[in-house]
Amino acid sequence: MRIANLKKAVWGLMAFASTLVCVMDCYPLIPAVYGVYCLSSGHTIIFYIGLIIGMGYFISIPSICKYLFIIAVIYFGERLFVRKSSKNGCVTTAVVAACATAVMNLSVTFLGRPDTDEIVLSVAESLVVFSMAFALCRACEYLRALEHNENPVIAGISG
C-alpha cells in the first residue's frame, strides 16, 4: 500500500517538476512526462493536480492553452496507437508527443508571419520532446523490470 502511494506521489512531483524546466519559453518536459504517464498503469488524480498547480503558477496563459491542447492530442494518440497495437510503446509515445508538439507549434507559427527562428525553435522543441519522452519511458521500463526482478534490458525490448 505504501509503495502504491509513493508511486502516486512521485507521478505528482514529476508533473509539477516538468513545469519548472523552461527553455526559451518552451516547456519540453510537459508533453514528455505526460506521454510516459499515459503508458503507466497507475493513473491517479495527483498527477493532474501537480500538473495544474505547476502550470498555473509558472506558465503564462497562452502557453497553458498550448500545452493543454498538446496533452489532449497525446492522450488520444496514445489511446489509438499504443493500446490497439503490440508495438513498442516507448517509440510510439515519443513520436506521438513530438508530432503533437510540432503540429501545435508550427500551426501557431504559420498563422502569423513565419520567421525562420520560430520554425527552427518549433522543430527543436519537438526533437527535445521526442528524446525526453523516449528516455523517460525507457527509464520507467527499467525501473518496472527491476521491481519485478527481471532482466531490465530484455524486459524493455520485449514490449
Identify the residue ranges that each predicted region occupies.
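Alpha-helical transmembrane segments and their membrane-interface exit regions
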Residues: V33-H43, I71-V82, F130
